[in-house]
Design a protein with these regions (language model features):
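Short loop/turn segments at beta->alpha junctions
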Residues: 6, 61, 100-101, 119
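Beta-alpha-beta core module
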Residues: 30-37, 41-43, 103-151
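Flexible hinge/capping segments at coil-to-helix
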Residues: 30-44, 48-70
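Short helix-loop capping/hinge motifs at secondary-structure junctions, enriched
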Residues: 51-61, 78, 138-140, 151-157
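Central regulatory/effector-binding core of bacterial HTH transcription factors
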Residues: 1-30, 98-99
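Secondary-structure junction motif
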Residues: 55, 68-90, 154-163
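A local structural motif
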Residues: 1-2, 87-97, 130-131
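Extended ligand-binding regions for polar small-molecule ligands
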Residues: 63, 143, 147-171
Length: 171
């Protein structure tokens, strides 16, 4: 069974024993979990309406975003990471809303309500899409971890999955 949610939702489900394993985007508090850090990095950027001037850019800078209506994640640990990227300009941003999952924020972007700060792989713009992704510059990247409860006894299938994952990352 696949379950989608933000890191806080996924960790809560793991803690309650409702799911065995979670795939979480950093930054995230993983102190009470066993984890495997994946090798790839996710890229931060802006989800913009395809017709906007921002959509025509190769990348966006702090200066490009200062006056735009922005939607950002509701996760405070990630907001702190974004604030570090913006430095002293963060307090001058026009943040109009927060989101827990990018899907609804992307719909708001599509309807011209604002621009969402997001990870690239969380949206899947097609040729018929009304939104696009433009990376931040300087580049902001984040890692991904696979987590599970410490000292958890798993089914043979889950145990095998974790071992296969560990083996594949050693190769």
């Amino acid at each position: 069974h696949l379950y989608s949610g933000n890191a806080d939702d996924v960790k809560e489900k793991i803690d309650k024993g409702l799911i065995d394993i979670g795939l979480l985007t950093e930054p995230v508090d993983i102190e009470k979990y066993e984890f495997i850090r994946l090798n790839h990095k996710e890229v931060w950027g802006i989800v913009a309406p395809i017709e906007s001037p921002i959509a025509q850019k190769e990348y966006v800078t702090v200066e490009d975003l200062i006056d735009l209506p922005l939607l950002i994640t509701s996760r405070s640990i990630v907001q702190n990471e974004i604030a570090n990227w913006f430095k002293e300009s963060y307090d001058h941003l026009n943040i109009i809303a927060t989101y827990n999952l990018i899907y609804n924020a992307a719909i708001m972007v599509e309807h011209g309500i604002g621009y969402a700060i997001s990870l690239e792989k969380l949206i899947n713009p097609s040729s018929s899409s009304k939104v696009c992704f433009v990376p931040l510059s300087p580049r902001l990247e984040t890692g991904t971890v696979v987590v599970w409860k410490k000292h958890q006894i798993f089914s043979p299938a889950t145990s095998r999955f974790i071992e296969k994952l560990k083996d594949s990352l050693k190769a």
